[in-house]
Amino acid sequence: LPHAIEPAAAQIARLGLSSRCELVSGSFFDNLPAGADVYLLKSVLHDWDDAHCVRILQRCRQAMLERPGARLFVIERLAPEHFAATPRDRAIARSDLNMLVSLGGRERSEREYRALLAEAALRATRNHALPSEYGVLEAVL
């Protein structure tokens, strides 16, 4: 989104990383800039149904082909395989319902995200656990 570039650029500059990052706005349904070391999707896939998720991931894969060793990081809430009556699971369930009603998407488990990545011909290599309901799935070609 174009309006997200300015605050992101300011934060990157504050961290002294401007020479290491390029921020590009656009649609992930169109061709993505090719040849980057890293591609990042945060809270994107849960907005969409499986077919749209695979299209987005295929666009990432297409862009990654230009750079051997390129990685994709997918940051999303990771739903449990079986929900329990915990505050964490309840928060994920509420978000899941919100995604379904408002956007037609849903929260998914790590297994479900790995399946979407595989369908897009990407291989999930690891899950970087975060101290929250979010996880960071790392994927390669």
Residue ranges and their predicted role:
Residues P2-L141:
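Alpha-helical subdomain
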